Regions:
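Short, conserved catalytic-motif segment at the N-terminal edge
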Residues: 164-186
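Mid-domain, small-residue-enriched loop/turn segments at the edges of structured enzyme/sensor domains
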Residues: 235-298
């Protein structure tokens, strides 16, 4: 506790000392009547200022701490705003590292970026996700230049220019949160709509509106093998037996989490239990899917066990002809693809060592669309692994 010299307004009386009207302190000379005097003289009083409790973010010697409403340092896993952070036993916020954190007795691998934001990593090994993949693991790349988001954009634009048709690309470097959005437009999403179906299901499970065990058998095939019947039946479950009501609830959920270019209006074929309610087509965009995977990565769509479950399903997606084809065999990729007519889309989280990022590409009428996605993916991975932040 620090002493403060303050001037007072006083009067004198026989047998009495100074009578204090109020105290002044600080650069603004604020009147603070609640301070208590510990010594008095004719015109000066020495008082003690009550020690103030720290609250919120504090930076000391370059280290970040957070204090709760009781003035205590936060430790362990904490949600601040809409993102998770992790604080060591001494209260220091951890940054820029991989860690394994235990949630309710379950060890969960995570990556912490330069801002201390914690992102979740799939626990499915790449070897398990890529059964039979015999590509040699390349040697480590040398980091020899500074990261520049404008360079990334120019590289993407150069690749896009070599292919015809319509392409939309979204990119986010998860360590810096620097983003690129090129040619974003609503498109028919094909099976990418299943991302929203999965998260709507988990959301309704957590709010107690649907029985997880009753529909659990649908979500794996829907994501891993893109089974349309499972999607159609899950939508029916989301609507308490009415698939169109399920679609309405999906749309409400998408709007609530900011996916305002995404909506479902019908089922998917080929598959049983197809449904439709009019002439509108399902719709989404590269930006929406990119933001979806960002929220999933940061644990903003579901609780920790369900977040981990969804990431593990996406890591096992069996279509690896697009973006996955441009990645080394040992690099994790949690994603979803969609294909129908002239459309082919792919997007998700690339777990490049120390430099995770999100990439989503929507294509319409692009010849050699898989070659485009593979080239795009190879370029982004190589850039991430050879640049310094």
């Amino acid at each position: 506790m620090r002493n403060i010299i303050i001037f007072i307004v006083f009067c004198c009386a026989v047998g009495c000392g100074a009578v204090f009207s109020f105290y002044y302190y600080g650069d603004d000379w604020l009147a603070v009547p609640e301070l208590s005097a510990t010594d008095d003289a004719d015109d000066v009083a020495v008082v003690q200022q009550p020690e103030k409790k720290l609250y919120g973010k504090q930076v000391v010697d370059g280290e970040t701490y957070y204090y709760d409403s009781n003035g205590e340092k936060m430790t362990g896993i904490q949600m601040i705003g809409e993102k998770y952070y992790y604080f060591a036993a001494d209260g220091v916020m951890l940054k820029n590292r991989r860690v394994t954190i235990t949630f309710d007795g379950i060890p969960v691998p995570c990556f912490i970026n330069d801002e201390g934001e914690l992102g979740f990593i799939t626990t499915v090994s790449q070897e398990a996700a890529v059964s039979g993949h015999d590509e040699a693991v390349p040697p480590a790349l040398e980091r020899n230049k500074d990261f520049n988001i404008n360079d990334v954009q120019r590289g993407i634009e150069t690749i896009m220019a070599r292919y015809g048709g319509k392409t939309a690309v979204y990119f986010n470097d998860l360590k810096t949160n620097q983003q690129i959005s090129l040619n974003n437009m609503p498109m028919y999403p094909c099976c990418m709509i299943k991302t929203a179906a999965l998260s709507t299901f988990m959301h309704r499970v957590e709010e107690g509106s649907i029985d997880y065990a009753q529909y659990q058998s649908y979500i794996g095939p829907m994501i891993i093998y893109s089974d349309n019947t499972c999607y159609n039946r899950l939508m029916k479950g989301l609507g308490d037996g009415d698939a169109l009501l399920g679609a309405k609830r999906l749309n409400e959920y998408c709007n609530a989490i900011g996916m305002r270019e995404t909506a479902a209006y019908h089922g998917l074929r080929p598959g049983a239990d197809y449904f439709t309610g009019g002439n509108s087509s399902n719709v989404s965009s590269a930006n929406d899917i990119g933001h979806y995977f960002e929220k999933l990565y940061y644990g903003q769509l579901a609780n920790v066990p369900h977040t981990q479950e969804m990431l593990n399903l996406y890591a096992q997606c069996d279509d690896r002809e697009g973006i996955a084809g441009g990645l080394p065999a040992n690099v994790g990729y949690a994603h979803k693809t969609g294909e129908a007519y002239a459309f082919y889309h792919d997007g998700g989280i690339v777990y490049a060592e120390g430099r995770p990022y999100i990439v989503v590409a929507f294509t319409d009428g692009v010849q050699n669309n898989r070659a485009f996605l593979k080239e795009l993916s190879s370029y982004l991975y190589h850039y991430q692994m050879t640049t310094i932040l």
